[in-house]
Amino acid sequence: MKLKKITFVLIVAIFAVSTAFAFQFSPFVEQTFSPTGADSTKSYTIVNDSDESIAIEMSTLIRDQDSKGNELNKSAANYFSIVPSKVIVKPQSTQIIRVQYKGPRTVTSELSFRLRAEQIDYSLGRQEQNQSMFNFLYVYTASVYVAPSKIVESVVVKQVTPGVNEDGEQVLNVTLANTGNVHQILTEAELTLLDNNGNRVILSGDKLPGIDGSNVLARKIITKTIPWPKELPYPETGSASYKAQITYSK
């Protein structure tokens, strides 16, 4: 499976107390750990290029998905060792963070996590007259995976059903199943639909909102709702049936 660029989520929270400073966190690609050996440990770098010390707290989260593909998280503290997990980074300096996987040594299906670098309030030595109304604190959230020894890549359409959304609009519910054992990013996805009357349509790009470019974690089944394709007659009764296939760039 080719290496894909990481998506870092930058969350800016506003707090009243003092002025805080942004930091840089790298690498900028998703990291895949091995359950054992040298690749069970990875290094990250925090760069503080400001003129003030900043405080950073590191943590890991289990990454899961609900039936709609929304991300769910809970602590993964038992899976990783992070050294240091809390650090004061001095002005114009860097700090190396070492993250080691400590979870199960036998992994048959990819494990998905988030690595979180969170700036926490740090006001030691600042004078009250230099304080401002807002404190901008930054959080970087990175993708982390623990790979199985053998990789199987496969996402299939489990079911498609017509429906009506809360606004009364005709929609198509598409249920996708990742039958492989690693996450799949549905880049350049194409969905081919065929109804029992022989009508056929191929959907891609902006006709697949929530599907094209989405990440389906290993062994997960998710349902996405998209607008009903105008090229396909909407069924007047519940007797319609559909065949569907999805392709994407791996």
Language model regions located:
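Short acidic, flexible loop segments centered on an aromatic residue
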Residues: 51-74, 181-200
